[in-house]
Amino acid sequence: MFMYPEFARKALSKLISKKLNIEKVSSKHQLVLLDYGLHGLLPKSLYLEAINSDILNVRFFPPEIINVTDIVKALQNSCRVDEYLKSVSLYHKNSLMVSGPNVVKLMIEYNLLTHSDLEWLINENVVKATYLLKINAYMINFKIDLTVDEIIDLVKDIPVGATLHLYNILNNIDLDIVLRISDEYNIPPVHDILSKLTDEEMCIKLVTKYPMDNVINFINQDVRYSPTFIKTIKDFVNEHLPTMYDGLNDYLHSVIIDEDLIEEYKIKSVAMFNLEYKTDVNTLTLDEQIFVEVNISYYDFRYRQFADEFRDYIMIKERRQITMQSGDRIRRFRRPMSLRSTIIKKDTDSLEDILAHIDNARKNSKVSIEDVERIISSFRLNPCVVRRTMLSDIDIKTKIMVLKIVKDWKSCALTLSAIKGIMVTDTINTVLSKILHHHRNVFKYLTSVENKEIAVCNCSRCLSLFYRELKSVRCDLHTDDGLLDRLYDLTRYALHGKINQNLIGQRCWGPLTEMLFNENKKKKLNNLMEYIKISDMLVYGHSIEKTLIPITDSLSFKLSVDTMSVLNDQYAKVVIFFNTIIEYIIATIYYRLTVLNNYTNVKHFVSKVLHTVMEACGVLFSYIKVNDKIEHELEEMVDKGTVPSYLYHLSINVISIILDDINGTR
C-alpha cells in the first residue's frame, strides 16, 4: 500500500504542479495538506485552518500575524523548542513575559529568557523572585533581597546546590540564617559569612558535619590556627581513615609542617598531602596495605611506580588483581537540567544534510531519480519528510524532485524478513502506513468513548464481548489467569481512551515510539524492566483506573527530541495508543518469566496474551500462530536484554488487526 492515502497524494500532486505554492491549490486540498503535514511555511490566509488542524503549525507563519495565545498553547504542547517556534516566541517575547507566571516558567525552561529579562521581571514585580528561583535558581546571577521567611520557604523546595547559589546572590544574607538552614535542612554553610563565627566548638561541629563540603575553607582565621582546633580536626581525619577528606587534608597540610606529617603518616602522606615518601612495599603494615588499596587512585597519579609495585605485590601474595581506579575520586557537580530545551542534537546524517548533498550534486552534475530515491530511502517511515523537505534551504527544483519520489512511496508489505530463523511477513511498514492513513479516524473513536465506564459501556465492541465486567477484581497475580485478567482490563480501558504510559516505571519504550519519534533506547530491555517488581504491574481490579490518563492528556510532542519528527498531535497520540498496547503485551510476558519465574508452556502463554488483547478490543474471531522458537527468544530477552524481534512482530500483527477493526477495514 502507498504510504499516503490517495487523496493526500492527489493534494500533494496539485501542490507540486503549483510550484509548492499552497495558496494556489483549492481549499479542499489545502485542508488535506494541513492534516498530513504536507507543507512548509504557511501564508496568513491559512492561519485559522492550520491552527485548528494542529496548534504547533503556529511556528510556520510569519511572526507578526501570530496570536500570542496560540504561541502559549504551542509552548505548552512541546518538549523542545525548534528554531521555528523559538523565532516566533522571541518575536513576541515582551508580550509572553507578561502573560502570567506559568508562561514565564515555560520560557525559562526553554531558555527563551536572558538574565536581563529575569531582572526586569523581578524589578517590575511581574513575578516574584522566589517563583523564578524555584524554577531555576542558577538563571539569576544578580543581587536580590529576600525576607527570612522567603529564604526558608525557598530552601525547602530547591536542591542543595541551588541553595548555595542563593547564598551568593542575596544582599541580606547573615550568619544566623546560614546556621539555621544548616541546622534544620542539613545544607553546608559554605559562604564567607561563616568567617564571622568565632565559637570554636561550633566551628568544629560544622566542619565534622560536612567533611566533604570544604566548610573548613570558610572558618574564621583565628579559629583555623587554634591548636585545639587543629588537634580536633586531625583526630577526626585519623579516626575515619582509610576514608579521606581532601579538603581537611589540605587544611592540615597548611598548618602542620611537612616533616611532621611524613613522620606520622609515612606512605599515607603521599595520598593525603601529596608529599614525597619512598618505601618498600614489602615493609608495609596491614593498616598501610588497606589504606593504599582503598586509595590506589591517588598513588596512580602521585607515585605511579609505587602503585605498580603494590599491584604486583598483591598479585603475587594474594593472587588477586587491583583494578585501575584513576579518576574515581574526581567529584563532578552538575546543575539540574530541564527536560525542555532549545537544543536539538543533530543526527550524523540528518535528512537536511542529505537534502543539501543532493542539491549540491544537482548543481554540479546530473543526478538520476534512482540515485535520489536510493539515498533518501532510509527515511521511508518518517511521516514528516515532505514538511522537512519543504522547510529546507535547497533549490525548489530539488524539492520537487524529492517530493515526487516521496509521494509514490509504498510500504513493503510483501517483504519477507528472517527473525530468529523464522520467515515472517514484515508488517511494520504496513502498520505505520495504516496509522498514517487512518490516525484521525482512530483518534476520533478513542475520544468518543474515553468518558464511558467500561463495566456498563454499551458501545458496539463492548456489546460483542462475552465478559463485560472487570475481570481482575478478584485475581491472583501469581497465576496465568490473574495476569491475563489484568491484561484484559488494561486493554479494555485503553480501547476506551485511558492508558498507563508508565506501567513498568518507564515511559514509552515500545517499538512504535522508538521508530517514529526518534526515541533511541540504548538501554537493554532487562534494564528498562528494572523496577517492574514495584511498578503499576502490581495494580489490578478497580485500582487500575487510578493509574490511567485519558489519551487526550498523554504525552505527544513531549516524546520527541525533535518536534519536526512528529506529524501532529493526533497522529502522535494514536501511535502512543498502539505502542502502549504493545508495552502491555511485552510487560505481561516479562513479568511472568522474571518475577514469577514461570517458564512452563511459554508458547501457549504468549498465544493467550495476544488473543486476550484482541478479545478485549472486541476482535473475537482472529487467530495468530506462535512459532515454537518464541521460547528461545524470550530466554535471551530475560538473560541478555535483547530485543524480542519475533514477539514485536506478533504484537504488531495484533495492533494491525485492532486498527483495521476500529477503522472498519477488516
Curated annotation (Swiss-Prot):
It comes from the Viruses. Keywords: Early protein, Membrane, Transmembrane, Transmembrane helix. One of its GO terms (cellular component) is membrane. InterPro entries: Poxvirus_E2/O1, Poxvirus_O1. The keyword Transmembrane applies. Induction: Expressed in the early phase of the viral replicative cycle. It is a single-pass membrane protein. The chain crosses the membrane at residues 574-596. Its main location: membrane. It is found in: Membrane. Belongs to the orthopoxvirus OPG074 family. This is Protein OPG074. It comes from Vaccinia virus (strain Western Reserve) (VACV).
